[in-house]
Amino acid sequence: MTQPRKLHIKSFGCQMNVYDAQRMVDALAPEGFVETANADEADLVILNTCHIREKASEKVYSELGRLRVAKDEAALQGRRMNIAVAGCVAQAEGAEIIRRQPAVDVVVGPQSYHHLPQLLAEAARGGRALETEFPVDDKFGFLPPPQPDAIRARGISAFVTVQEGCDKFCTFCVVPYTRGAEVSRPVDKIVEDVRRLADNGVREITLIGQNVNAYHGDGPDGRPWPLGALLHHLAKIPGIVRLRYSTSHPRDVDQSLIDAHRDLPALMPFVHLPVQSGSDAILAAMNRKHSADDYRRLVDRFRSANPAIAFSSDFIVGFPGETDEDFAATLALVTQIGYAGAYSFKYSPRPGTPAAELQETVSAAVMDERLVRLQELIDSQQAAFNAAVIGTTVEVLFERAARNPGQIVGRTAYLQPAHVMAAPDIIGQVLPVRIDSLERYSLIGELAAPQQHSGFATRSEDSPQSLPITTGA
């Protein structure tokens, strides 16, 4: 009997890369590969990379240096280790990766990982394999579906890609160059994927795409469907109790998506809606094609449809030309919107993007100071959001055993981790939990008696008031 070959995948960056890594595992399973958590014992190591920020790509080269040593040690033991670089760094840098690190055997872009078996065979013949073209074939049509055992092993929550690529061409962003133009999968293919996941124990689906609300896949009626229509369709699939989506662009939010938040109990009231800056001048320089007030009005529309909605976002500080007044406008926007959480980053010029050519740069010291101020504001809002849950009863979807013996951990509608003492048989269920305390970012509570809920949280008379957030006009 042939011994299985060991595969280790390390992913950097976004949720799409987590999903892509799972599909690479599925693509390589028929070739006899099984996953291992130990890269040093693997026959194949894949670095699934992100190119959004300079630090992310440099981490990849640092990891490749370590893997070169592991590959040499494997050779001394009479064992061959193949190293592959996949994802957006592979797409952007191509053959430069092999030049910088000759230990790499395969370089494959994110639109071609269904070709991994052929590329590995090519490398086994003594060469190096490189594929970073945007192929005309649809990779999803060539990828084998995950096996039932693999689905169950991955837990009760799953990502499903519905859209890839981006046509927005924000001046700071490499995604249109590394992921290509916006492409949407047909509705029936997505439904097929979700039914398979539900049949094997998945209870929560997160629809993902570089610009997920630009979704316009062909529906069963022959017409393009928007994301809102797709969500309505998926909410009917038995077994799926929660739906999410990420990441959204403000320009592509339409009324069907807002209506879905009004109408679908399964659609979680938590929206990741990146804005990047609160300054109209900087938004224009970024080619975002919306103003800060456009964003405020959009938030108001969501909240009018469902007052329980909370938001997270992305922010960049130190974009070329950002003045003190521009940064103050960002702080004002954050204060006015009120976020349950957000990600903030210092601007990092990416080669080949229009912003990388801008001369009016912001000093590193100023960027550092602005990042600290912004993150302190965001952290204070997140702390207030979490503290407001203490003394309430919230619905939690339980996912797995926690690190502490006897504890089970799940997530609220707003992705807050919640821990209770309970038996493992609650995994996969949505149950009411009375929140008693907060430990850093995790909620601690106990199972509550089943009861009817008017929303996603019920408050006692002496509990904190509703979330400390306001909206603009």
Curated annotation (Swiss-Prot):
Annotated signal peptide: none
Pfam family, one: Radical_SAM
Needed cofactors: [4Fe-4S] cluster
Binding site for [4Fe-4S] cluster 2: C166, C170, C173
Region (Disordered): 452-473
Chain residues that bind [4Fe-4S] cluster 1: C14, C50, C88
Cofactor note: Binds 2 [4Fe-4S] clusters. One cluster is coordinated with 3 cysteines and an exchangeable S-adenosyl-L-methionine.
Domain MTTase N-terminal: 5-125
Matches recorded under Gene3D superfamilies: Methylthiotransferase, N-terminal domain, tm_1862 like domain
Catalytic activity: N(6)-dimethylallyladenosine(37) in tRNA + (sulfur carrier)-SH + AH2 + 2 S-adenosyl-L-methionine = 2-methylsulfanyl-N(6)-dimethylallyladenosine(37) in tRNA + (sulfur carrier)-H + 5'-deoxyadenosine + L-methionine + A + S-adenosyl-L-homocysteine + 2 H(+)
Family per record: Belongs to the methylthiotransferase family. MiaB subfamily.
Record's function text: Catalyzes the methylthiolation of N6-(dimethylallyl)adenosine (i(6)A), leading to the formation of 2-methylthio-N6-(dimethylallyl)adenosine (ms(2)i(6)A) at position 37 in tRNAs that read codons beginning with uridine.
Alphabetical list of NCBIfam families matching this protein: miaB-methiolase, MiaB/RimO family radical SAM methylthiotransferase
Protein name: tRNA-2-methylthio-N(6)-dimethylallyladenosine synthase
Organism this protein belongs to: Rhodopseudomonas palustris (strain BisB18)
